[in-house]
Amino acid sequence: MSDSPERVYPMLLDFVRKETISKNLLRVTLTGEDLIGFPEDQNGSHIKVFFPNQASGILQLPVREGDNVIWPEHKPVPRAYSVRQYRAAVNELDIDFVTHGEETPGGGWALKADIGSQIGLIGPAGPDPLIEPADWHIIAGDLSAVPAISAILEKLPSDAKGYVFIEVDEIEDIHDLVHPEEMAINWLMRNPHDTEPALAKAIKQLPSPEKATSLSAFIAGENQSVINCRKILRNDYQIARDKLYAIPYWKRGKTEEAYHDERHDVMDAVY
């Protein structure tokens, strides 16, 4: 029998500190009594974060009554993120935020966060592991996927082999990652004039791995890029569907709210 407390829905977490990882990637550390018992082995997993209402600036969290969710007057803004790391010994959770200005609910909150700042959180959730065991791995994503990619690389066995492609808009976002020696890290600069996403182009040009009896892949980031990469991996590399996890986080030109249903359609599509 577990002595862990019953999970609160959602958890209320307090700001502890923040750390700049790169020009547009900011790590925020959180804590709180609700966090006690959070699983330690879920780095990279999906979480839902609730930010203060954008009109009022007030953080009120939904409550569960039976099978129903009751939303407060000042409805919070939900966004999906990844667990970067949880340290049970000190009960601290790290979340990495992409910051492209203070007008975004998540990045804006992270930039302004200070002692006294709070958020709500539900999770973790999603597949475990994020990438399936295989002889070779292909990992690709943009800056929004770096927290999950970093967690995956840290969990892989030391003799793991494969390729990692990360697309960024600015050279200042390139930074060191902990990774197995034979996982080749490739940073790509996005060219807005390219007709084909950089990640898909890079994967298409990969040499076939020698002596590999199995391949697995993790792809995350912008919608069209994920779709293109997924198609190449399935059609050209013949990666089995259960060895490929492809998840779009966002779509260029669309807000989170406008993209929500389409995102789930992409994830649920048969490929």
UniProtKB/Swiss-Prot annotation:
Gene Ontology biological-process entries: cellular response to iron ion starvation
Required cofactor names: FAD
Keyword Manganese: no
Record-annotated FAD-binding FR-type domain positions: 8-131
GO MF annotation, one: ferric-chelate reductase (NADH) activity
Stored InterPro entries: FAD-bd_9_SIP (IPR013113), FAD-bd_FR_type (IPR017927), FNR_nucleotide-bd (IPR039261), Riboflavin_synthase-like_b-brl (IPR017938), SIP_C (IPR007037), SIP_fam (IPR039374)
Main function: Ferric-siderophore reductase involved in iron removal from the siderophores after their transport into the cell. Acts as a major ferric-vulnibactin reductase catalyzing the reduction of Fe(3+)-vulnibactin, a catecholate siderophore synthesized by V.vulnificus. Catalyzes reduction of Fe(3+)-aerobactin, a citrate-hydroxamate siderophore produced by other bacteria, in the absence of IutB. Catalyzes reduction of Fe(3+)-vibriobactin in vitro. No activity with ferrioxamine B or Fe(3+)-enterobactin.
Family statement: Belongs to the SIP oxidoreductase family.
Protein name: Ferric vulnibactin reductase VuuB
Gene: vuuB
